[in-house]
Amino acid sequence: MLDDSLLEDFIHSFFGYGSDSADLWFIGMEEGGGTTEDEIARRLSFWQSRGQNELEDVCDYHEALGMGDFFREPVKLQRTWAQLCRIALSAQGEPDDLAAVKAFQRDRLGRWNSSNCLMELLPLASPGTGHWLYPNWSKLRFLSSREGYKDRVLPMRIRSLKQRIEERQPFCVVFYGSVYRDHWESIAGSAFTRIDPDGFGWVKKNGTNFLITQHPAAKGITNQYFQSVGKFIRSLRRL
C-alpha cells in the first residue's frame, strides 16, 4: 500500500512542472499515467526526496520515473506536450515544425528555468477518466471512488489555482480540455465571453489572458489548430 500521509500531502501540494514566474501557463485536468502502484510510489518518493515542491522540473521528475525518452535523443514526443510546445513556439513567433517541437519538449517545456509551466487541476496521475485504481493502493476514504476524490479535491484545487494566478499574474493561462469549461471559468473568475472563429475561447481578467482550447488528444484535432492558438497569444502581446 502507498504511504497515505505522503499521498495526502501530495494531493494538497503538488501542482505540476516548471516555474510559476513564467508568463505562459498550461492547465489541464489531470496527468496521464498512474497505471501501477509502483509508479505512484516512485512519483511520491522522488517528490519527497526533492523537498515536496509545488512545481517540479518535468525532465528530472520523469527521468526518475524511467521516462527519460521524452528528454533525450532520439526524442519521443508525448502527445499532449507536443501540442503545448507548438502553442508556445507559435506564441513566440518561432517555427513549430516537428524538429522544433521535439527540441522544445526536450529542453524548454516545464523546466524550472523555463518561460512556461504545466499544471493540473487534479493532482493524481490516472490512465483515463474511466479508470480509478487508487482504492487498490490507498486506505484514504475519499479515494474510494473517482467521484469522492473529485468532490473532496476540486474545490480546494480551484481555490489554490485561482489564488496563485492572482498573485503571480501570468500573461496568459491556457486551459486545455473544453469539456471542463465550468472548472476553467471558476478559476478565471469569468465566463469565456468570446469564442474565436478557430474554436477556442478567450477572456481577459485582471491583466491575465485566459484561453480555453480543445484537448491535444481530442479526436480530429490538427497541428494547425494549436498553431492558431499560439498565433492568437502572440497577437495579444501587440495589443
Label each region the model flagged.
Residues I27-G28, I165, Q169-W184:
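Glycine-rich anion-binding loop/nest that anchors nucleotide
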Residues S13-G16, D60, F175, G199-G201, ...:
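Intrinsically disordered, low-complexity N-terminal regions enriched in serine/proline/glycine
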Residues M1-R168, P216-K219:
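A polyanion-binding, active-site-adjacent surface
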Residues M1-L6, K139-K162, V179-L239:
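C-terminal capping/extension of enzyme domains
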Residues V58, V75, V101, V153, ...:
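Extended aliphatic helical segments
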Residues A22, Q169-F171, K204-N209:
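A short helix->loop->beta-strand "cap" motif at the edges of active sites that frequently abuts
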